[in-house]
């Protein structure tokens, strides 16, 4: 019974059906213009939401899907614009080959809550904070890019991405989640939180210190992780079947507290 009490999550990925099980639909599409360019195609239809106060399921007519069309500086930007909670949540399904950018004020947060997101472009966090409110909230993103003074909170959810590109001064908080990187990347910012960090392919170059990272790090057979700071992998366990490089020949690194387990192929 969702007519009262607290609802966890968001109804954006639910479909509205009639008594016979038929999906109710009356969709329209609209171009979304940014700086004079068509950056996305929006689909509007009947939809369910959990309300601003998470106090039930509500029927409305609104945005149900975003099809990303552009990349780089022309990408669609999401901005909290002073809103919080569900008012700053994007629950519509995000698809397409374009990039998805975020550019809020430093203390503001945009959340994503549709587990059916499957966009393949870059997730470009240019300003503010991003909160994952579902598994695969970042779709099938090819890269997670965090600028200085930005933050991504995985909030206990799972995500697979191509590369990580975290600038110095950024924070990626795994926060009980599970992050898999298939193509490595560069982490010059802070990695924090518990959970799991899996590098299944490519080279991940970790140059920043991450003393608050307690997650288990797993290096797959086809992956390489290069560590340039004693606190790069925090205090979590490191399991490696691939290649783990600690510093350089003339500047070796001793992991501060991590336990390293090496398998036969590691």
Describe the function of each predicted region.
Residues 1-91, 174-176, 181-183, 199-203:
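Extracellular/surface-exposed low-complexity segments
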Residues 100, 178-179, 197, 266:
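Hydrophobic beta-strand segments of well-ordered beta-sheets in folded domains
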Residues 1-3, 9-10, 21, 26, ...:
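Surface-exposed loop/turn positions within long extracellular repeat scaffolds
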Residues 77, 99-107, 197-199:
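Short, contiguous hydrophobic alpha-helices characteristic of membrane insertion segments
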């Amino acid at each position: 019974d969702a007519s009262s009490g607290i609802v966890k999550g968001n109804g954006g990925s639910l479909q509205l059906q009639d008594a016979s099980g038929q999906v109710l639909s009356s969709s329209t599409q609209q171009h979304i213009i940014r700086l004079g360019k068509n950056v996305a195609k929006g689909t509007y239809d009947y939809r369910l939401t959990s309300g601003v106060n998470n106090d039930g399921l509500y029927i409305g007519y609104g945005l149900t899907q975003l099809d990303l069309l552009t990349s780089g500086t022309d990408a669609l930007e999401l901005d909290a614009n002073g809103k919080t909670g569900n008012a700053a949540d994007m629950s519509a399904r995000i698809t397409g080959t374009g990039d998805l950018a975020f550019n809020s004020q430093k203390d503001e947060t945009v959340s994503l809550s549709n587990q059916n997101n499957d966009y393949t472009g870059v997730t470009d966090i240019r300003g503010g904070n991003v909160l994952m409110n579902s598994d695969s909230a970042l779709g099938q993103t090819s890269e997670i890019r965090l600028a200085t003074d930005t933050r991504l909170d995985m909030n206990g959810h799972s995500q697979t991405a191509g590369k990580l590109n975290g600038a110095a001064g950024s924070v990626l908080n795994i926060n009980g989640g599970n992050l898999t990187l298939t193509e490595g990347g560069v982490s010059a910012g802070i990695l924090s939180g518990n959970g799991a960090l899996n590098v299944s392919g490519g080279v991940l170059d970790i140059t920043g210190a991450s003393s608050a990272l307690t997650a288990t790090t797993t290096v797959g057979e086809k992956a390489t992780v290069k560590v340039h700071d004693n606190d790069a992998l925090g205090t979590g366990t490191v399991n490696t079947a691939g290649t783990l490089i600690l510093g350089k020949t003339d500047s070796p690194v001793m992991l501060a507290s991590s336990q390293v387990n090496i398998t036969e192929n590691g």
